[in-house]
Design a protein with these regions (language model features):
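Exported/periplasmic ABC-transporter solute-binding proteins
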Residues: 1-217
């Protein structure tokens, strides 16, 4: 932290499940998750630092502008395989998903798929950026990424007639919303608490918003 040079921060990736396990084992002081905790993870102390929408993305040239959540579930389960059933071209849908253990995948599974598995024929990638790149170069593909990562390379579908936006996330009309969590073993203290307090401060929340996430304060 530039304002507190005595506090060093080492950030490692690996997905939400890795963040949860690292926190539970004591391998880190702050774990991170971009999905809700599972029942067997609730022994951790969780702090919501931001919220984020999940966007269902397609190539900008795709004439399909929206879908229902039920249709999205059918696409990712492999039951709906052609764009013509959504008013698009008579072309097979290329499905792109995230890897197991990803918080984005976990949130999508919980919010869209429920107990239904994503079908085996889907292309699996290990980052939101890679999913976006594939969709940006395949006119007949579909994937899901953080709403904050949607750019001019791809287009987000309206879901059940609602566009993903900060306003619609805050008013509850856009349903694909997940938390960004900090996790600790018990109430945070010392430098850990100082860092979390900074993230929740006006300055920290402004940085959250700058990164495309929805501040909680």
């Amino acid at each position: 932290m530039e304002s507190r040079p005595a506090i060093g921060i080492n950030v490692q990736g690996g997905g939400s499940s890795a963040g949860v396990q690292a926190c539970k084992s004591g391998a880190c002081q702050i774990g991170m998750s971009s999905r809700e905790l599972k029942a067997d993870e609730k022994d951790l102390h969780e702090i919501v630092i931001a919220r984020d929408g999940l966007a269902i993305i397609v190539h900008p040239s795709n004439p399909v502008r929206g879908a229902t959540l039920a249709q999205v579930k059918q696409i990712f389960s492999g039951d709906l395989t052609n764009w013509k059933f959504l008013g698009g071209p008579d072309k097979e849908i290329t499905v792109v998903t995230r890897e197991e253990g990803s918080g984005t995948r976990g949130a999508f599974q919980e919010l869209v798929m429920g107990t239904t598995r994503i079908f085996r024929g889907a292309i699996t990638e290990d980052s939101n950026g890679t999913v976006r790149e594939i969709v940006a170069h395949d006119p007949y593909s579909v994937g899901f990424i953080s709403l904050g990562l949607v750019n001019e390379q791809v287009r987000a579908l309206a879901l059940d007639g609602v566009v993903g936006s900060e306003t619609n996330i805050r008013n509850g009309s856009y349903k694909l919303v997940r938390p960004f969590l900090f996790l600790t073993r018990g109430e945070p203290t010392g430098a850990v608490k100082a860092f979390i307090d900074f993230v929740l401060s006006d300055e920290g929340q402004a940085l959250v918003k700058k990164e495309g996430l929805i501040p909680v304060k």
